[in-house]
């Protein structure tokens, strides 16, 4: 079934109004006189907890053994790790064994952990195997001038409308999606889906937002045909939910900065604007109603902020993880 985000916001509010415990008559009687729409069912086993660790999970070989042991023993249902099989690391070929090891370990509520691979589709990363000597912004043409908003050196915005870039992402054994499938991941986390908001990207392609929706849909169609049940988790990009192609393509969303953000100079604890949080929660509720589980990563370095984020996320039905900006190790703030 095709939905628009506006329809979903209304439908989820209608269902909540019919089921909710507010007093007063007013609109309550009118809502209850109609049969509320039923929430859709997610297309995959939804974890109760997850952790994201994007550094030092195999790319350094034996030096990362303790980190991998810690991930295997940690009581999380799902793990989001970098797909080192697509990196230039000398240990790239160990990725499948690492995924297998993590799969074999138990989660907090699942007998075996789910493992998702990190794939950046909106930026070119200079440490990936596809990056060639001599590449620089403008050469090749799809690598655009600009810096990563989070301050990570060597990451560049891309014109993702480029067939060459899209071929790097999926469609051949060496592509990012194909490697993730071959290495045994349960799915992928698509980062920088919001690449359509970058000024250099808009200058190169004024229809960047629609192009990204088509791009994600093409990735999902390809991946699910190659590995049925492969899960597509998309980063942020709530605006794309008004596009039915995108909404049908993604299985879940991961929203960053729901309660606390970070910057290039601050690892976390930047309180999100309350109006922004309220709007995010409304839109994310609609996505959950459409059968799209919502994950969230908030960036905090204090116990008080971590506890606040976990408590508020749980009350909103959001699967939360709190860590610092680097995501370089398991957080010391485990979910309660």
Predicted regions: what they are:
Residues 1-8:
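Bacterial N-terminal signal peptides that target proteins for export
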Residues 15-18:
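C-terminal motif of bacterial Sec signal peptides marking the signal peptidase cleavage site
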Residues 20-24:
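Bacterial signal peptide processing site
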Residues 27-29:
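Intrinsically disordered, low-complexity N-terminal extensions of nucleic-acid-metabolism proteins
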Residues 31-336:
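Glycan-processing catalytic domains of CAZymes
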């Amino acid at each position: 079934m095709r939905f628009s985000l506006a329809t979903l916001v209304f439908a989820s509010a209608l269902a909540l109004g019919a089921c909710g415990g507010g007093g007063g008559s007013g609109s309550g009687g009118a809502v209850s006189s109609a049969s509320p729409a039923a929430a859709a069912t997610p297309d995959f086993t939804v974890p109760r907890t997850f952790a994201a660790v994007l550094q030092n999970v195999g790319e350094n070989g034996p030096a990362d053994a303790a980190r991998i042991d810690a991930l295997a023993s940690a009581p999380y249902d799902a793990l989001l790790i970098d797909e080192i099989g697509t990196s230039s690391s000398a240990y790239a070929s160990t990725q499948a064994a690492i995924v297998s090891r993590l799969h074999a370990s138990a989660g907090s509520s699942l007998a075996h952990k789910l493992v998702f691979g990190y794939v950046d589709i909106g930026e070119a990363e200079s440490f990936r195997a596809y990056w060639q000597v001599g590449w620089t912004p403008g050469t090749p043409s799809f690598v655009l001038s600009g810096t990563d908003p989070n301050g990570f050196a060597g990451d560049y915005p891309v014109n993702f409308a480029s067939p060459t870039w899209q071929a790097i992402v999926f469609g051949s054994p060496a592509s990012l999606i194909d490697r993730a499938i071959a290495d045994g991941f349960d799915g992928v986390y698509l980062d920088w889906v919001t690449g359509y908001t970058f000024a250099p990207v808009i200058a190169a392609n004024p229809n960047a937002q629609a192009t990204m929706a088509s791009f994600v849909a093409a990735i999902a169609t390809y991946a699910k045909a190659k590995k049925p049940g492969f899960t597509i988790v998309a980063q942020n990009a709530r605006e794309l939910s008004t596009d039915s192609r995108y909404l049908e393509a993604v299985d879940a969303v991961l929203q960053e900065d729901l309660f606390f953000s970070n910057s290039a100079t601050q690892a976390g604890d930047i309180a999100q604007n309350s109006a922004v949080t309220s709007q995010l929660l409304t839109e994310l509720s609609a996505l959950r109603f459409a059968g799209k589980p919502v994950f969230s990563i908030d960036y905090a370095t204090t116990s008080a902020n971590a506890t606040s984020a976990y408590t508020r996320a749980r009350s909103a039905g959001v699967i939360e993880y709190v860590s610092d900006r680097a995501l370089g190790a398991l957080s010391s703030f485990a979910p309660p």
